[in-house]
């Protein structure tokens, strides 16, 4: 699972996801990609599940780039604990994803395989996505 090796602070504020992605909105590495269409927090487990679905369908051919990283800790209090007495312990790591952000990029496979693989990966994510392809140069 993806998580930072070291952080400045153990816990973070919840925050909000405003606006659209300006950086990471275009394909940089691969020929095909999966682009987010809505703001959402995506967990490290969801990223890993999508990556596995992607590589399995591609039969380990080609190359995959993960363009997001879960760097935000989400804390949770144990079950049946009264309110108060501080914030809970960090439970999982999430990535804040803005609309327009490219989540995955792939290369080395044909359009049909790429579309099917990215559709399978999209099913593992809690967000509406779109298949994008680099314009032939």
Swiss-Prot record:
Pfam families listed in its UniProt record: Ribosomal_L16
Phylogenetic lineage: Bacteria, Pseudomonadati, Pseudomonadota, Alphaproteobacteria, Hyphomicrobiales
Record-level Gene Ontology MF annotations: rRNA binding; structural constituent of ribosome; tRNA binding
Family (UniProt): Belongs to the universal ribosomal protein uL16 family.
Protein name: Large ribosomal subunit protein uL16
NCBIfam families referenced in this protein's UniProt entry, alphabetically: rplP_bact
Subunit architecture: Part of the 50S ribosomal subunit.
rRNA-binding found in the keyword field: yes
């Amino acid at each position: 699972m993806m998580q930072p090796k070291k952080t400045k602070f153990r816990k973070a504020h919840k925050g909000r996801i405003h606006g659209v992605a300006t950086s990471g909105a275009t394909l940089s590495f691969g020929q095909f990609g999966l682009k987010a269409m809505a703001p959402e927090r995506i967990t490290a487990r969801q990223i890993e599940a999508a990556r596995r679905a992607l590589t399995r369908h591609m039969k380990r051919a080609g190359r995959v780039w993960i363009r997001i990283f879960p760097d935000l800790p989400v804390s949770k209090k144990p079950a049946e604990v009264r309110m108060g007495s501080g914030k809970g312990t960090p439970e999982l790591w999430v990535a804040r994803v803005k609309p327009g952000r490219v989540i995955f990029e792939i290369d080395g496979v044909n359009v049909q395989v790429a579309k099917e693989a990215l559709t399978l990966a999209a099913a593992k994510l809690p967000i509406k996505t779109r298949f994008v392809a680099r314009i032939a140069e």
